[in-house]
Amino acid sequence: IPGKGHLCGHDGHMTIICGLGEKLSQNRPESGEVVLLFQPAEETGEGAKAILEDPRFEEIRPDAAFALHNLPGYPLHQVVMRKGTFAAGSTGMTISLTGKTSHSAHPEAGINPAQALAKLIQKLPELPKEVSGFALLTLIHAELGSLAFGTSAGKASLSMTLRAFDQGDLESLIDLVKNEAKAKADKHGLKVDFGFVESFAVSKNDLNLYPIVEEVARELGLSAVEKPDPFRWSEDFGLFSQICPSFLFGLGAGQDCPQLHEGTYDFPDELI
C-alpha cells in the first residue's frame, strides 16, 4: 500500500510466530500447552488490553508469557535481556483549558488561557525531578484558540508523553501534572479537563524466567547480553506482566539496521 508500512517489525514478529507454530507441530512438547498469540494493535496500547478483557482469554491464560522485539543497533541475532523492568511504562496525556472568548480589542471581557498555557509549558517538563525514580515528560503539542485576529482565545490544549521505569512513579507523575494544571487553571479562572491515550504498562521481567531464556540462547548458540538500563520506549506486553510471570527480550536486528519507526526501516528477513 503506497505510503504505508510496518516500520516497527510487527510483520516480522508475526512471521516468526508462524514459523514457531510450524516447528512445534513437527516436534510437540512432551507435556503442557503452548499458546501462540497473534495480538493486534500493539502500537496503540489497546491490543493487549482487549485480549486480557476478552472472556475467552481465561481459556488460554498462561502460566508464563514470553515475547520478543527486534532491536536495530544490536548485532544480528543477539539476545538482549534484563532482569526486572525491561521497558518503560508510558501514557499520552492532554490538558484542556477552557476560558471565554472575547473581541481581541477587549480581552478583559473574556478569559484567555494563554498565560496558564505558557506557565505549564515552562513548569511541566521539570516535574519528573520530583519523582524518586527515572521519569520523563515530553511536550508534543500545544494549541491556543484559532487563527482569528479579531478574537481573544477562549480555549487551549497541551499534549505530552509521560514515562517512567516504575508503574508507581508513572502514576505519581500523572498526579503531579494534574495538580499543577488544576492550580494554574484555578488561578486564571479556567476549567480544566484531562484526556489519556496510548497508555502502556511497565514491562517487568520475572526473575525466575531469566535463566530459562538465558539457557535457550546458549543452546541455540546465540550471543546474549545484559542491558544495564531499561529501554525508554514502551510495549503493551507489559500488561501481561500484571497477570502472570512474563519475560520480554530483544533480538538484535543488525548494527546497521535503520532505527524503528524510521522511513527506511525494513525488518531483516535473516531474523525469521
Predicted segments, located by residue:
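Histidine/acidic-residue-rich, glycine-tolerant segments that coordinate divalent metal ions
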Residues: 2-5, 11-12, 30-141, 145-151, ...
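DPxDG-like acidic metal-binding loop motif
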Residues: 14-21
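Generic recognition of short, well-ordered alpha-helical segments
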Residues: 19, 46-50, 108, 172, ...
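A generic secondary-structure signal
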Residues: 23, 54-55, 183-184
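Short connector loops/turns at beta-strand edges and beta->alpha or beta->beta junctions
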Residues: 23, 98-100, 253-256
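Surface-exposed acidic, glycine-flexible loop patches that form ligand/cofactor-binding
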Residues: 25-29
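Metal-dependent amide/peptide-bond hydrolase catalytic core
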Residues: 115-272
